[in-house]
C-alpha cells in the first residue's frame, strides 16, 4: 500500500530525531488509546493487520494532521463503524444511542495484557 504512512526518504520533512529515553506513551490518554484498540480487537473481530490498515488508509492531509495515537483512535472508530459496533452519531455524541450489537463478548480485563504480548 502506497500512501502518506509510507514516506521513507521523502524530502521536505526533515530527519527523524528520536528523544533520548523516549517513553512509549507521552501522556495517559495515549496509553488508554492503545489499550482500547487492543481490548476491542477480539469483540470487533479484527487483527493487527486490519487495525494497521484502518490507521494508515486515510487521505494524506488527515494522516499527516494527526498524532500517532490520534491515528490509532481514528482507525478504531473506522473498524467499529464498519462492524456495526458503534455509529458515527454515537461517536460524535460521545454516548450510546442504540442497544449494543447482540453476541459481542467483551475481552476480560485479565486478558488484555496477554493480548498485547501476542
Describe the role of every protein-language-model region:
Residues 1-118:
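A charge-rich, low-complexity, intrinsically flexible signal that marks solvent-exposed coils, linkers
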Amino acid at each position: 500500500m502506497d500512501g502518506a504512512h509510507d514516506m521513507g526518504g521523502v524530502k521536505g520533512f526533515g530527519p527523524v530525531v528520536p528523544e533520548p529515553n523516549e517513553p512509549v506513551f507521552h501522556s495517559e490518554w495515549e496509553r488508554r488509546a492503545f489499550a482500547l484498540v487492543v481490548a476491542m480487537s477480539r469483540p470487533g473481530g479484527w487483527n493487527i493487520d486490519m487495525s494497521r490498515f484502518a490507521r494508515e488508509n486515510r487521505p494524506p492531509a488527515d494522516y499527516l494532521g494527526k498524532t500517532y495515537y490520534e491515528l490509532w483512535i481514528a482507525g478504531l472508530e473506522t473498524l467499529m463503524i464498519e462492524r456495526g459496533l458503534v455509529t458515527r452519531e454515537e461517536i460524535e455524541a460521545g454516548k450510546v444511542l442504540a442497544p449494543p450489537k447482540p453476541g459481542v463478548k467483551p475481552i476480560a480485563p485479565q486478558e488484555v495484557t496477554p493480548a498485547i504480548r501476542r
